[in-house]
């Protein structure tokens, strides 16, 4: 089987669109084998309504024997009532141009005012101003919101690769 990786659009037939050069350009590619394996970028292709199904849930007890690891605390990132980043329709994102974590209230205030989800650039998550689950870009979460507002972000191609599906 042939492989077409990173598909961003899949019209009818065996022709596909995929990003190249870290999202700076797109290429039209065509599958040339009878069988194709296709991978998509996150949220690139919407799900038709009503195609979901239920799955059976089966409980079981795992025998872990002598545990060498002890879980002290488990926590999920708080989304503060906002849509999960990969599904968000409105996103307000910021970068190092905010000059410090003490200025992040501006981003939160704007996001709250318009009902958006917050995001950040990789440098912001790397230096610890924001949690890594808010990092959008080539090495973070790829998003496709209807509106993407970037504040203090330089626009590096790695960042743009994760937000180029924004409308």
Language-model segments: what does each one mean?
Residues 1-167:
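N-terminal glycine-rich FAD/FM-binding segment characteristic of electron-transfer flavoproteins
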């Amino acid at each position: 089987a042939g492989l077409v990786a990173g598909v961003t659009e899949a019209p009818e037939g065996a022709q596909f669109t995929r990003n190249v050069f870290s999202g700076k350009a797109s290429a039209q590619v065509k599958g040339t084998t009878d069988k194709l394996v296709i991978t998509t970028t996150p949220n690139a292709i919407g799900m038709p309504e009503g195609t979901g199904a239920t799955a059976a849930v089966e409980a079981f007890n795992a025998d872990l024997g002598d545990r060498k690891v002890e879980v002290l605390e488990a926590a999920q990132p708080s989304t503060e009532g906002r849509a999960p980043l990969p599904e968000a329709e409105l996103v307000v994102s910021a970068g190092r141009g905010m000059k410090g974590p003490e200025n992040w209230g501006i981003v939160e205030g704007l996001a709250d005012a318009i009902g958006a989800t917050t995001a950040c650039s990789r440098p912001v998550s790397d230096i610890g101003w924001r949690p890594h689950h808010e990092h959008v870009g080539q090495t973070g979460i790829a998003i496709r919101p209807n509106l993407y507002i970037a504040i203090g972000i330089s626009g590096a191609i790695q960042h743009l690769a994760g937000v180029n599906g924004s409308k």
